[in-house]
Amino acid sequence: MAIKDWPQGEGPRDKLLQQGAARLSDAELLAVLIRNGISGQNALTTGRLLLSHFGGLRSLMTATEDKVCQIPGVGPVKYAQLQAAAEISKRISRENLQRGQILTNPDLTRDYLMRQLADRSYEVFALLLLDSQHRVIQFVELFRGTIDSASVYPREVVSLVLEKRAAAVIICHNHPSGIAEPSQADRRITERLKNALATIDVSLLDHMVVGDFEIVSFAERGWLN
């Protein structure tokens, strides 16, 4: 049965308006975005098929167009709608960590980095540049590709830090494998960068490694002492 033929108040859109978006299941939220189903398959069923096929929202939102459009009832238009929702979520996260904001909440930093890096299919090495009061100056993606001790150049990091007049730095990168546990190469890179930054009196506050569902902090493990 089409959702428009359901009793008043039972459809996902009505439920959202009456009870709030937080009360909807993942499939119901997808149904609101998808809007229309196909013959014999309403939007809620399509949402459930998407979740079942991809295993969850994160995998769905990071899947390529050709893979998403393999699901019955999903074409380029619906794929575009899903991607727009995912991008809005990312942009909200960016606004939550604005220039001039003081980093007093580690959870805010973790959430920001998770949103920026967890869904990448390739490695990204980035810097979160801070001033002397630990206020955000800028988030910069510095290197992409296979990140190892040979591909991260301390002189480029130092040059950028000097250019932006940062007083402290949080370095971060993701593991496309989804496993956040740092490698020995990660530890070597961190030591090299810590020593390079020390020559210009800039503090390395942390190195955060981003996986699919967690972030490992070098500072919390005592690896920066």
Curated annotation (Swiss-Prot):
InterPro entries: MPN (IPR037518), RadC_JAB (IPR025657), RuvA_2-like (IPR010994), UPF0758 (IPR001405), UPF0758_CS (IPR020891), UPF0758_N (IPR046778). One of its GO terms (biological process) is proteolysis. NCBIfam families: PRK00024.1 (NF000642), radc (TIGR00608). Zn(2+) binds at residues 173, 175, 186. A motif (JAMM motif) lies at residues 173-186. Belongs to the UPF0758 family. PROSITE patterns: MPN, UPF0758. Coiled coil: none annotated. It comes from the Bacteria. Residues 102-224 form the MPN domain. One of its GO terms (molecular function) is metallopeptidase activity. This is UPF0758 protein Sden_0326. It holds the Pfam family RadC. The keyword Protease applies. It comes from Shewanella denitrificans (strain OS217 / ATCC BAA-1090 / DSM 15013). Keywords: Hydrolase, Metal-binding, Metalloprotease, Protease, Zinc.
